[in-house]
């Protein structure tokens, strides 16, 4: 029973870290990466689809993303979708290739982004702690119902705490890496 609780808790904590990683990846640094356009959608045959489904998205250099639509007539729509995406990007079409240069971040904008990143990391840590609380509550319920001994309950809570420490450390490492990435010029 305790092992099931631990496995469930670990899976949920792992998912919390993955969500944090995804959220941190969405925060734009001065460096280009193709994942930046994952959330941008463009109209194609009457429905909204991600840019990656109608175009080849590549890195041209460290500060420029290249977007080459599979169909030439989509270039204008893709360019407009990127411009209207609230990412602060200014794409420029060069023939059938759309160049998306990454604007330099100002010092003030970097500090604002660091606040956002720290908030995301704190949400991740809170999520991990909530999983710990739920697991410990489940263990206490089993103890109260006399399905496990006090020693088993204590060992279970200690194991859940170790998992919590492990995943909070992982979240902190992600935060530190993102902060360093943001402050690099």
UniProtKB/Swiss-Prot annotation:
Q: Which Pfam families match?
A: RRF (PF01765)
Q: A GO biological process this protein is involved in? A: cytoplasmic translational termination
Keywords of the record: Cytoplasm, Protein biosynthesis
Gene Ontology cellular-component terms for this entry are: cytosol
GO MF terms here are: ribosomal large subunit binding
Q: Name the CDD domains on file.
A: RRF
Q: Quote the subcellular location field of this record.
A: Cytoplasm
In terms of InterPro entries, this protein maps to: Ribosome_recyc_fac, Ribosome_recyc_fac_dom, RRF_sf
The family note in this entry says:
Belongs to the RRF family.
PANTHER family, per the entry: MITOCHONDRIAL RIBOSOME RECYCLING FACTOR PSEUDO 1, RIBOSOME RECYCLING FACTOR
Q: What does this protein do?
A: Responsible for the release of ribosomes from messenger RNA at the termination of protein biosynthesis. May increase the efficiency of translation by recycling ribosomes from one round of translation to another.
Mind telling me what this protein is named?
Ribosome-recycling factor
Source organism of this protein record: Neisseria meningitidis serogroup C (strain 053442)
């Amino acid at each position: 029973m305790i092992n099931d609780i631990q496995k469930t808790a670990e899976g949920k904590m792992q998912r919390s870290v993955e969500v944090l990683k995804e959220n941190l990846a969405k925060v734009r640094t001065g460096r280009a990466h193709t994942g930046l356009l994952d959330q941008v959608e463009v109209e194609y045959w009457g429905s909204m689809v991600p840019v990656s489904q109608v175009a080849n998205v590549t890195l041209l250099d460290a500060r420029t993303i290249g977007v080459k639509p599979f169909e030439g007539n989509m270039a204008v729509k893709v360019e407009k979708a990127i411009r209207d995406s609230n990412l602060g990007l200014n794409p420029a079409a060069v023939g059938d290739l759309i160049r998306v240069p990454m604007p330099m971040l100002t010092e003030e904008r970097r500090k604002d982004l660091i606040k956002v990143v720290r908030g995301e990391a704190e949400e991740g840590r809170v999520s991990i702690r909530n999983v710990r609380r739920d697991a410990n509550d489940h263990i206490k319920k089993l103890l109260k119902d006399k399905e496990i001994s006090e020693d088993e309950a204590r060992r279970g809570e200690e194991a859940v705490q170790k998992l919590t420490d492990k995943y909070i450390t992982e979240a902190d490492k992600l935060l530190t890496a993102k902060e360093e990435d943001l402050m690099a010029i």
